[in-house]
């Protein structure tokens, strides 16, 4: 069985497209195919918004790796290899941002699973130049194209979606970039969590902060707390920072692969835990979050999360804390609480 994802396998079949090129890899890349690519190219750089993948790929000196919500560095790339992301809006964002950086004349290769909507590249790329499908395998497609027009200048501020929420009399302005969970809307799970939260004090972590809804609400309702917000996704971090700024709130926003970069003395860990990874469901991060939570809480520390009721989280929480209470429940979501 190949160590590569299906999109990487179809790219591997077409290595001639990359020979002698300066390649910039971006999008939903999840494996070490860029290392093999580097053996055939003049240079390979990887831009990722996924902090977990960045921590993995940055250890390899044969390629240059960047993490962020936009590529700040100058690039000499003449070919963009785009792994099609799960959200169409994120694909549009990546094309606009990266082609503005690479300019007219650059080539593009797009790979992705057919179920991810990769076919959308045919219409999406029309503004830049021609693109055509050249291979199909493993339920994936391989497209090649060329940017023949000078792309518009990119301004990240143009890509934020803005919306307002009002919970318990707290009015908040939310800023959300493409690629963020529940982009541009207030999800019902987070709403139930905010309606249920008790008064908070001390150092509080919003784990998996997304667009910053939960963290901003906690800071506005409990102005004395020391707020920290983390996420694996760079678009989420940029969105949370923008949400805090839009509401005149303060908090430390940082990247963390589960607990890789967090403190270990929180009074509260509050979360709407992520359980989707790409197009698939992945419970590992949430199970680690819950199972290891006591190690990152102070002696009086408490964990409060919202989760889909069908997820088997209570036994994990019970095993970690020796207690687990349900604070609130609807037919779809449950609020779980545990304390040390």
UniProtKB/Swiss-Prot annotation:
One of its GO terms (cellular component) is cytoplasm. One of its GO terms (molecular function) is 16S rRNA (guanine(1207)-N(2))-methyltransferase activity. Its main location: cytoplasm. Keywords: Cytoplasm, Methyltransferase, rRNA processing, S-adenosyl-L-methionine, Transferase. The keyword Transferase applies. It is found in: Cytoplasm. It comes from the Bacteria. Specifically methylates the guanine in position 1207 of 16S rRNA in the 30S particle. Belongs to the methyltransferase superfamily. RsmC family. This is Ribosomal RNA small subunit methyltransferase C. It comes from Vibrio vulnificus (strain CMCP6). The gene is rsmC.
């Amino acid at each position: 069985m190949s160590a590569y994802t299906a999109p990487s396998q179809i790219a591997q079949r077409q290595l001639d497209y990359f020979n002698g090129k300066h390649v910039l890899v971006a999008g939903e890349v999840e494996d070490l195919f860029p290392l093999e690519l580097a053996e055939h190219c003049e240079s390979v750089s990887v831009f990722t918004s996924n902090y977990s993948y960045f921590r993995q790929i940055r250890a390899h000196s044969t390629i240059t790796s960047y993490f962020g919500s936009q590529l700040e560095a100058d690039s000499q790339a003449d070919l963009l290899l785009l792994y099609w992301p799960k959200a169409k809006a994120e694909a549009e964002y990546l094309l606009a941002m990266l082609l503005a950086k690479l300019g007219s004349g650059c080539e593009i290769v797009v790979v992705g699973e057919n179920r991810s909507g990769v076919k959308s590249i045919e219409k999406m790329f029309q503004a830049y130049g021609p693109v055509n499908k050249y291979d199909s395998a493993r339920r994936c497609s391989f497209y090649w194209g060329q940017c023949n027009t000078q792309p518009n200048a990119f301004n990240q501020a143009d890509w934020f979606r803005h919306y307002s929420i009002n919970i318990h009399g707290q009015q908040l302005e939310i800023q959300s970039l493409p690629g963020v969970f529940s982009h541009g809307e207030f999800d019902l799970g987070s709403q139930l969590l905010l309606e249920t939260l008790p008064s908070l004090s001390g150092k509080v972590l919003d784990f998996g902060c997304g667009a910053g809804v939960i963290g901003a609400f906690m800071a506005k309702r409990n102005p004395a707390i020391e707020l920290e917000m983390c996420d694996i996704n760079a678009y989420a971090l940029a969105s949370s920072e923008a949400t805090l700024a839009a509401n005149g709130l303060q908090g430390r926003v940082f990247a963390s692969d589960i607990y890789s970069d967090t403190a270990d003395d929180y009074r509260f860990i509050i979360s709407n835990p992520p359980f989707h990874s790409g197009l698939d469901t992945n419970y590992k991060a949430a199970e680690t979050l819950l199972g290891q939570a006591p190690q990152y809480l102070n002696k009086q520390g408490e964990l409060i999360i919202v989760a889909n009721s069908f997820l088997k989280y209570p036994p994990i929480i019970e095993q970690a804390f020796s207690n687990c209470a349900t604070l609130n429940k609807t037919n779809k979501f449950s609020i779980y609480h545990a304390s040390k």
